């Protein structure tokens, strides 16, 4: 059992998500947990479970500063909050893509900066959930080297498919239809199915199982610099050591892009 004095703050803890699952898993491991979200009403079940909840809009510097000032000490920061956007590059709304980058990259770094004084004092840890956030993965490598002299560990959390509200929220908050003039018109149905992640919706690791595994990894005496958890995460890890492009056919079959390719070619 981890000492109750250890504290963790997790961003993006709305109910049904991976952040909420992490909050529960950390509490069960003996941590004092600060669960945060932009809308505190979406963390009601966590409050009922005895988990402390704080308001945090990661896109607001004022909100970040207020949240950081309300925490007296911190051992682990988990940058979990983020968003997703599925659209072929040819049809992508660049302004929307820039907003996504603000959420998934710059906001994460702003949160890390705000809580860094606490983490340096405790010689703590920063962990960033990384699915499609490739830029954050690169920044994690930089932070790991830069913060090592201060005793702060930086862990890159690479996650496969997890059964959570992420895909559901994506369908609600982001466009899932191609524009009328898309070059993918001959394969519209197949492309939009891939954008909705139809083939991936029911194959994810249960969020509570994923969270327990991640907490177990992070609380090891010497946690790995990169943690691979979630369905198909091992496949992603294997792909990093294979020749570039070797996994293309597997990824196409997993996502439905093989069907897209067939329809575009025969059009």
From Swiss-Prot:
It is an enzyme of class 1 (oxidoreductase). NADP(+) binds at residues 10, 36, 42, 57, 80, 129, 133, 162, 164. Induction: The expression of the dibenzodioxocinones biosynthesis cluster is positively regulated by the transcription factor dibT. Keywords: NADP, Oxidoreductase. Its EC number is 1.1.1.-. The keyword Oxidoreductase applies. The keyword Oxidoreductase applies. The active site is at 129 (proton acceptor), 133 (lowers pka of active site tyr). Short-chain dehydrogenase/reductase; part of the gene cluster that mediates the biosynthesis of dibenzodioxocinones such as pestalotiollide B, a novel class of inhibitors against cholesterol ester transfer protein (CEPT). The biosynthesis initiates from condensation of acetate and malonate units catalyzed by the non-reducing PKS pks8/GME11356. Pks8/GME11356 lacks a thioesterase (TE) domain, which is important to the cyclizing of the third ring of atrochrysone carboxylic acid, and the esterase GME11355 might play the role of TE and catalyzes the cyclization reaction of the C ring. Pathway: Secondary metabolite biosynthesis. This is Short-chain dehydrogenase/reductase GME11361. GO terms for cellular component: endoplasmic reticulum; lipid droplet. GO terms for biological process: phosphatidic acid biosynthetic process; triglyceride catabolic process. One of its GO terms (molecular function) is triacylglycerol lipase activity. Belongs to the short-chain dehydrogenases/reductases (SDR) family.
